């Protein structure tokens, strides 16, 4: 059985290195999808393409998909979904079997390698959610709400249920949920300027007008960028029992994201068996989230 880690990419070179490093021994391939336009419709450099030499040790595992054929639209969500569904273009370049597994997540949604190992051992015929701890800004600011958007699907489920619209799996709340299955690192290590840049370019254009000064206030106070009803908890690193693997790389990470335009940078089974990172059943299944995904 093979595992393919598939995600869309914007410009976060250091976070990309972290993801590739911690998952390299646990997946067979990476499908990295980057585009010539932002979700807001603005031209952007191909940051991975321009910096491939920084990732030479992983290149033999990476299928790089460049999206330059967006449909003509003013809708940022149409562009977002189109780019994510282009994961299928990467899968078509691999010898993927029906029993193989596809991880579908954003770059900052880091799967737990132990969870992937369990799935590889036990298999999956349809879909499961990776229940992740959600951090904002740093590794000491934990959001009380769990994050359920990252999914793992079998290639058979992708072909016959999703009908190749792989991005739609993020909107499904499946019966199977794998606990302690990763870490969502929202705006991790970002300065106010970098956050403002991302907000101007991503699909949630309703948040694109937030000022840099307002962002700095929210960063300093460790409060939500979008005034949502979210509870932030400070948890010292020494007291955290579920830190990401090799978290020292995250602490030392200098985010390489830059304002656009810019030159190239130089620099799993039943709950009782797997208590820490196993599959459990979502007994009270809720309806899927609305068509616009939750802001990350």
Question: Which stretches of residues belong to each language-model region?
Answer:
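N-proximal low-complexity "stem/linker" segments adjacent to membrane-targeting elements
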Residues: 1-14, 18
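Short beta-strand-to-loop acidic/aromatic patch adjacent to the donor-nucleotide binding site
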Residues: 99-110
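Conserved catalytic core of nucleotide-sugar-dependent glycosyltransferases
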Residues: 114-201
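Active-site-proximal specificity loops/subdomain of glycosyltransferases
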Residues: 44-98
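Short, acidic, metal-binding catalytic loop of nucleotide-sugar glycosyltransferases
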Residues: 22-29, 33-37
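Low-acidity, Ser/Thr- and Arg-rich intrinsically disordered low-complexity segments
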Residues: 269-272, 280-286, 291-292
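C-terminal catalytic/acceptor-binding lobe
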Residues: 172-270, 276, 296
């Amino acid at each position: 059985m093979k595992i393919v880690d598939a995600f869309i990419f914007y410009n976060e070179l250091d976070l990309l290195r972290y993801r590739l490093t911690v998952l390299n021994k646990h997946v067979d391939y990476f499908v990295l999808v980057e585009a010539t336009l932002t979700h807001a419709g603005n031209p952007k450099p191909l940051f991975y393409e321009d910096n491939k030499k920084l990732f030479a040790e992983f290149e033999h595992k990476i299928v790089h998909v460049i999206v330059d054929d967006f449909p003509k639209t003013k809708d940022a969500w149409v562009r977002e979904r189109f780019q994510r569904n282009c994961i299928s273009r990467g899968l078509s370049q691999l010898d993927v079997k029906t029993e193989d597994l596809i991880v579908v997540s954003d770059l900052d949604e880091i799967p737990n390698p132990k969870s992937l190992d369990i799935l590889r051992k036990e298999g999956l015929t349809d879909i499961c959610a990776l229940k992740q701890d959600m951090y904002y800004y740093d590794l000491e600011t934990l959001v009380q709400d769990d994050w359920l958007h990252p999914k793992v699907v079998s290639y058979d489920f992708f072909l016959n249920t999703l009908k190749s619209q792989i991005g739609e799996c993020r909107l499904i709340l499946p019966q199977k949920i794998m606990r302690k299955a990763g870490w969502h690192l929202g705006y991790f290590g970002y300065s106010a300027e970098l956050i403002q840049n991302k907000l101007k370019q991503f699909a949630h254009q309703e948040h694109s007008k937030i000022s840099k000064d307002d962002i700095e206030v929210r960063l300093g106070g460790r409060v939500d960028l979008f005034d949502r009803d979210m509870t932030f908890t400070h948890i010292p690193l020494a007291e955290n029992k579920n830190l990401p693997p090799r978290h020292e790389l995250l602490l030392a990470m200098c985010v390489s994201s830059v304002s656009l335009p810019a030159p190239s940078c130089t620099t799993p089974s039943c709950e009782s068996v797997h208590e820490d990172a196993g599959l459990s059943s979502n007994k009270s299944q809720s309806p899927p989230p609305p068509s616009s995904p939750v802001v990350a």
